[in-house]
Amino acid sequence: MSIRERLLATVSKYIAAYNEFDPSAMKTVRTPTCLTHGVAPTCKFTQSMEEHTRHMMLSRGVFRSVNASIVDDNITVVDEVSRQVVVKVKIRCETTVGPYENEAMFIMAMNEEGALVDEIFQFLDTARFRQFQGRLEEAQ
């Protein structure tokens, strides 16, 4: 398997684990030192693997199902040298306050073998995310 194929296979495994919305599934595709970064100006954060796991556990009370998919393989960017992949993702969720949909760009940096995600940068559509947060606040 070429490095490009390995990187794309890792992205597919990550998306599948993301859809399970289970911290143990996410741990199978990430290095123990993997960092998650929210990079939108109004939604900046950095989470260690432990922090990301805690966040997922808390969020499971809100999200009943998660379905993320790559929007268009033709705009996926693979940098074999730096072991990075950029994908545009559509996210559809069923939540305690009804449906939630968003789009995001994921920049995923893999380990040397290309088999595990070592760092991920997420850029969400913050307007949609803020609307969803407002619905959650109204429901409380």
From Swiss-Prot:
Pathway(s) this gene product operates in, as recorded in its UniProt entry: Secondary metabolite biosynthesis; terpenoid biosynthesis
Domain of life: Eukaryota
InterPro entries: Fungal_Meroterpenoid_Isomerase
GO BP annotations, alphabetical order: terpenoid biosynthetic process
Subunit and partners: Homodimer.
Note from the entry: In A.calidoustus, the austinoid gene cluster lies on a contiguous DNA region, while clusters from E.nidulans and P.brasilianum are split in their respective genomes. Genetic rearrangements provoked variability among the clusters and E.nidulans produces the least number of austionoid derivatives with the end products austinol and dehydroaustinol, while P.brasilianum can produce until acetoxydehydroaustin, and A.calidoustus produces the highest number of identified derivatives.
Family recorded in the similarity comment: Belongs to the trt14 isomerase family.
Function, as annotated: Part of the gene cluster B that mediates the biosynthesis of austinol and dehydroaustinol, two fungal meroterpenoids. The first step of the pathway is the synthesis of 3,5-dimethylorsellinic acid by the polyketide synthase ausA. 3,5-dimethylorsellinic acid is then prenylated by the polyprenyl transferase ausN. Further epoxidation by the FAD-dependent monooxygenase ausM and cyclization by the probable terpene cyclase ausL lead to the formation of protoaustinoid A.
PANTHER family associated with the record: AUSTINOID BIOSYNTHESIS CLUSTERS PROTEIN F-RELATED, AUSTINOL SYNTHESIS PROTEIN F-RELATED
Full protein name: Austinoid biosynthesis clusters protein S
Organism: Emericella nidulans (strain FGSC A4 / ATCC 38163 / CBS 112.46 / NRRL 194 / M139) (Aspergillus nidulans)
Taxonomic placement: Eukaryota, Fungi, Dikarya, Ascomycota, Pezizomycotina
Gene: ausS
